[in-house]
């Protein structure tokens, strides 16, 4: 049975990637974008899809895995190119991108080792990717608090990325009733991720949707 929530979530994720790439290429700048968050997302998708060529579910799943891995790597390449194309903006981004990601990666490794469905390398990496994805946006939000504002395209990107995971909550409910499947790890980490975005969603609605301007944090 067609799961519209899953598809809507995936396309929201694709939209966030397109918005981010457009923001970098049209402005020729990485102003307000966290390289550390992009590195974390790349790590998320690489560790989650280690079974890319060994476990076949559907053509849709296979293509989405390819898109998410390749696009996350492509974004990092685009951002690194700005070091030479726009060195001033790139250095400014590096200066502001100060979140210590080791404090995210190490606990997520430990959680992956403790909470998994089978103590195997692929399963531990899969669990690690869920925990890491739930907090991967934190360097971006931390940068936002340091600058106090974000361009419209950047805020649209963060919103679409948060919406993707929020849509997975009704997806899990749908799967529970249609497939009698309940993935506790995915649900728990997904709820954490949605809560991480909650303040941003409210400010985005108030500042960007209602007023149509750039996103600015309240003083």
Swiss-Prot record:
Major localization listed first in the record, in broad terms: endoplasmic reticulum
Transmembrane portions of the chain: 4-22, 37-54, 63-82, 103-116, 124-143, 156-174, 185-205
Pfam families found in the cross-reference section: ER_lumen_recept
Subcellular location: Endoplasmic reticulum membrane
GO annotations of cellular component type: endoplasmic reticulum membrane
Topology feature Lumenal, residues: 1-3, 55-62, 117-123, 175-184
Residue ranges, Cytoplasmic side: 23-36, 83-102, 144-155, 206-219
Site (Important for specificity of recognition): 51
PROSITE patterns, alphabetized: ER_LUMEN_RECEPTOR_1, ER_LUMEN_RECEPTOR_2
InterPro entries: ER_ret_rcpt (IPR000133)
Membrane topology, from the record: Multi-pass membrane protein
Keywords: Endoplasmic reticulum, ER-Golgi transport, Membrane, Protein transport, Receptor, Transmembrane, Transmembrane helix, Transport
GO biological process, one term: protein retention in ER lumen
A molecular-function term among this protein's GO annotations: ER retention sequence binding
Function text: Required for the retention of luminal endoplasmic reticulum proteins. Determines the specificity of the luminal ER protein retention system. Also required for normal vesicular traffic through the Golgi. This receptor recognizes H-D-E-L and D-D-E-L, but not K-D-E-L.
Stated family: Belongs to the ERD2 family.
Name of the protein this chain belongs to: ER lumen protein-retaining receptor
Lineage: Eukaryota, Fungi, Dikarya, Ascomycota, Saccharomycotina
């Amino acid at each position: 049975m067609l799961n519209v929530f899953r598809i809507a979530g995936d396309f929201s994720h694709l939209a966030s990637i397109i918005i981010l790439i457009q923001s970098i290429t049209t402005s020729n700048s990485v102003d307000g974008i966290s390289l550390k968050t992009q590195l974390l997302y790349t790590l998320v998708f690489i560790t989650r899809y280690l079974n890319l060529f060994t476990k076949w579910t559907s053509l849709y799943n296979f293509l989405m895995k390819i898109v998410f891995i390749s696009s996350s790597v492509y974004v990092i390449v685009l951002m690194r190119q700005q070091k030479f194309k726009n060195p001033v903006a790139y250095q400014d981004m590096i200066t502001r991108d100060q979140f210590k990601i080791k404090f995210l990666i190490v606990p997520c490794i430990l959680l992956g080792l403790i909470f998994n469905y089978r103590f195997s390398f692929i399963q531990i990496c899969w669990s690690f990717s869920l925990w890491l994805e739930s907090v991967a946006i934190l360097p971006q939000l931390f940068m936002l608090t340091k600058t106090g504002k974000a361009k419209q395209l950047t805020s649209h990107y963060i919103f679409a990325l948060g919406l993707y995971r929020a849509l997975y909550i009704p997806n899990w409910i749908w799967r529970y009733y249609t497939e009698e499947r309940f993935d506790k790890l995915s649900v728990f980490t997904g709820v954490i991720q949605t809560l991480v975005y909650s303040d941003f969603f409210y400010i985005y609605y108030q500042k960007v949707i209602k007023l149509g301007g750039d996103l600015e944090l309240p003083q």
